[in-house]
C-alpha cells in the first residue's frame, strides 16, 4: 500500500501544479506583473477558504489574497471554478451515457436546469463579461481544466481499485461520481462526499 499512497500523492501534487499553472495564466490576463509565488499563495488561500465553505464556494475568494485587482480576480476565480465544473459534468455525462445508454434522453434533459442556472448567473454577473473578454487563451484554460479533472479522477480510481486490475465500469463510473458531487448544493469540507456518492 505504500506505493499506492505515493502514486496517489503524486496525482494530487500534479493536480495542484496544473491548477497553479491555469490560475497563473488566468490571473496574468488581469495582472501581468503577478509572480508565481503570489499566484500559488492566492491559489492555496482560496483552497483553504473552499475547504471550510459549503460547495467549496470559498475558492472564488482567491483574489482577496492579492494586493490589487481583487474584484476582477474574484470574477476570474469564479470563471475558473465554473470551467472546471462544466468539464466535470461533461465527463460525468459521457460516463453516464456509456454506462446507461437506455437513459440518454433523461440524462440530457437533466442538464437543462443546470444550463439555465449557468446562463442566469452569467447574465446577472455584469462585470464578468468585461473581465472575461481580457482572457485570450480560453483553449489552454479548458485544456488545463480537462487535465486537472483527469488527474483527480485517476487519483480517486487508484484509491478505490484496491488490488484489482482496471475495470471499464469503474473507470466510467468515477466521472459520474465526480459530476454528482459537483452538482450537490452543499458539500461542507468535502468530508465523505465522493465516497457517499460512490456508494
Name each model feature, range by range.
Residues 44-61:
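Short intracellular "coupling" helices and adjacent cytoplasmic loop segments at the cytosolic face
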Residues 36-38, 69-85:
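Membrane-interface alpha-helices at helix entry/exit sites of multi-pass transporters
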Residues 1-43, 88-186, 193-196:
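Predominantly cytoplasmic-facing regulatory/coupling regions of multi-pass membrane proteins
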Amino acid at each position: 500500500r505504500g506505493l499506492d499512497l505515493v502514486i496517489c500523492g503524486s496525482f494530487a501534487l500534479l493536480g495542484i501544479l496544473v491548477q497553479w499553472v491555469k490560475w497563473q495564466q488566468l490571473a496574468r490576463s488581469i495582472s501581468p506583473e503577478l509572480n508565481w509565488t503570489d499566484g500559488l499563495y492566492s491559489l492555496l488561500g482560496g483552497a483553504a477558504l473552499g475547504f471550510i465553505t459549503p460547495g467549496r464556494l470559498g475558492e472564488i475568494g482567491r483574489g482577496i489574497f492579492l494586493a490589487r485587482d481583487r474584484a476582477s480576480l474574484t470574477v476570474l476565480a469564479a470563471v475558473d471554478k465554473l470551467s472546471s465544473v462544466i468539464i466535470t459534468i461533461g465527463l460525468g455525462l459521457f460516463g453516464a451515457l456509456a454506462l446507461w445508454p437506455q437513459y440518454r434522453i433523461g440524462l440530457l434533459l437533466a442538464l437543462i436546469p443546470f444550463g439555465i442556472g449557468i446562463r442566469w448567473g452569467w447574465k446577472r454577473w455584469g462585470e464578468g463579461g468585461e473581465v472575461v473578454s481580457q482572457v485570450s487563451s480560453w483553449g489552454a484554460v479548458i485544456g488545463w481544466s480537462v487535465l486537472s479533472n483527469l488527474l483527480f479522477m485517476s487519483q480517486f480510481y487508484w484509491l478505490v481499485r484496491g488490488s484489482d486490475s482496471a475495470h471499464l465500469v469503474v473507470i466510467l463510473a468515477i466521472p459520474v461520481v465526480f459530476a454528482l458531487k459537483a452538482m450537490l448544493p452543499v458539500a461542507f469540507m468535502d468530508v465523505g462526499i465522493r465516497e457517499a456518492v460512490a456508494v
